[in-house]
Every structure is written in C-alpha cells, then in structure tokens.
Regions:
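Phosphate-group recognition and catalysis centered on beta-loop-alpha active-site segments
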Residues: 17-318
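Sec-dependent N-terminal signal peptides
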Residues: 4-13
Length: 318
C-alpha cells in the first residue's frame, strides 16, 4: 500500500513538472537536469548533503530514498575505492566513524577502505548520526546508489573526479550519465582534455574558493578565457563584498551559482547557514541573501526546511 502511494505521488509530481514548465520530460531527473542547465530558470535546485543523514545513516540507500520522497533535486554522495576495486559510498577514507568496524574486526585490522574488500565491508553495519549501529543497513556501492536514483533524482558525485573513468562506465551502463554532476578544481585545460576522450560526459561544475588564491585564479581563468560553465560552486568564508561582486559577474555571464549552506565557513560566515535558518521563524531571513544574489542551486543539510521555504515563495515548482 505504501509503495502504491509513493508511486502515485511520483506520477503526480512528474505530471506537474510537465504542465508547469510547458515541456514534457521522460522522468523527474530529466526535468531537474533541464533546470540545472537553464541559466534563465528561476527554479532553485536543492542538493542534499550525504542524503537525509539526520534520520538515516549518511550515504545510505534509506538516506537516498528519504530525500527523493521529500522532493529534493540532487543527492550528493562521496566515493571511495575498495581493495578489490569496487566503488562504494563513503565520505571518510576509513570506516570507523560510520560503521561498527571495531566490534566486527577488532583493533588489529586496518579500517581504511582501500585496505578492505567489498565482501569485508558488507560484514559491517552503518551507523546512524547518533553513533548507533543499524541492524541491516550496509554501505552501498555506487552502482546500487545510482540504480536507486535513476530517473528520480539527479546525483552529485563528490570526492569522485579521480574515479571519473570508472564512474562514467557505470553511468553509461545504467543510462544515467545525463543525470550525474561531478565537480572539481582542475584547470579548464585539464578538464577539456580529459572529457575529450569520451563522446558522452557527465555534467561538470568548477569549484571556486573565491577568497583563496588558487580558487580565485581558477575563477578568473574561466572569465579571461570566455569559458562559461553550466554553473560555479562558489565557496567563501567572510562576508566582505567578494561574493556579491563575483555573483553578479557569474549571472551576467550566463552561468549559474551553487552555494553550500551546510557550514557557515563555506557560505559567508556565521549567520548564513542552514542551522541559522532553523532558528528563524522566517527562513527567508537567511536564504533570501543567496536568492537575491542570483543563487539557484543550494546544497543543504536541512533540505526539508529549505524546500518548504522555496515552495512558499514559488521557487521550487517544476
């Protein structure tokens, strides 16, 4: 019965996307990707940092299912490679924080993912945010995660550019390449040369730390060479006018802006993050700063809160 209800809701959302946008899309992920690529779109794309980690183990299938059902647009996930070359979802290089590794293997075995086989990792149970191990939730492979996300939500592969070739092989096999976003800090030339090897590539977005020398240099290289990416992920730690200036330039260039409200250190300092918004009755006291500066993609640690606010102002209706 629950599955039927979820399917009905999914169909209703998809039908709404088609009617409101004036275009027909094969699935919700395709509709989201279209908004991501459209610099004129006023739709604000919501990305979920490691999924719904407040209620389920981070980077897990239940955490992914939860954000899909709440109406999020992008599932952000992290990748690591096992000893036997299986891509799994993990932010950390080892499994100590997120699994019951010590209980299963003791202290004599290396907890690094690169030292563990996939079979060994499957003996572990993932932990909830409160450090309590689940009974059945395992660390998923990238293939399993993408199969869950396929056509339902777009995916941002974080900490994954080094595995580009492996990731692309999986996305091509599953038919989801156009639904996947990968980001990085490599030069324009490096990215262009690497992607030239393939006929079909994932979406790419440069990360620019505008208050750091290398990050600002990367941003300036795009501007000076006249290269207009789909969007920039902009990071900055102090509100001193730097962001406002560069945001105006980005919007004028025909690109989009992605910001991270997960931590204040990434979005202008204290008073600008999701936890600050949580303390305000009017979430616009925090989020409107970004919207007023042309931001149309936000990675959040409180996606339900952000989605509710965006819907209330007509900025999250496909």
């Amino acid at each position: 019965m629950k599955r039927t209800i979820f399917l009905i809701l999914a169909v209703a959302v998809l039908a709404s996307c088609a009617s409101e946008s004036g275009r027909q899309y094969a699935n919700r992920a395709e509709a989201i990707a279209a908004q991501m690529r459209d610099p004129a779109s006023k739709y604000v794309v919501v990305a979920c940092h490691r999924g719904d980690w407040r209620n389920f183990p981070e980077n897990s299938i239940p955490a992914i299912e939860s954000v899909i059902r709440m109406g999020a647009d992008i599932m952000e996930l992290d990748l690591k490679l096992t000893k036997d070359s299986v891509l799994v979802l993990s932010h950390d290089a080892n499994v100590l924080r997120c699994t019951n590794f010590t209980k299963v293997f003791g202290k004599d075995k290396s907890p690094k993912i690169k030292d563990l086989t996939y079979e060994e990792i499957q003996q572990l149970n993932l932990k909830r945010a409160h450090d309590i191990a689940t009974d059945t939730v395992k660390m998923p492979t990238l293939r399993q995660a993408l199969a869950c996300c396929k056509d339902r939500i777009c995916v941002n592969v974080d900490q994954g550019y080094e595995f580009y070739d492996m990731v692309l092989a999986i996305t091509e096999e599953l038919g989801v390449t156009d639904q996947i976003l990968i980001k990085g800090k490599k030069s324009i030339g490096e990215v262009a040369a690497h992607e030239a090897k393939y006929e079909h590539n994932m979406m790419y977005m440069p990360i620019v730390d505008i208050q750091k020398e290398k990050g600002l240099a990367l941003y300036n290289s795009y501007k000076e060479q006249g290269v207009v990416p789909m969007a920039y992920e902009v990071c900055w730690g102090q509100s001193n006018g730097d962001f406002e200036k560069i945001a105006a330039e980005i919007v004028a260039s025909g690109s989009k802006i992605w910001v991270n409200t997960i931590w204040a250190s990434l979005c202008g300092g204290i008073g600008h993050d999701d936890d600050e918004a949580y303390m305000h009755e009017n979430k616009g006291d925090v989020y409107d700063y970004f919207l007023d500066n042309g931001v149309s993609m936000i990675q959040s640690d409180r996606p339900a809160q952000l989605i509710e606010y965006l819907k209330s102002i007509g900025r999250h209706n496909l």
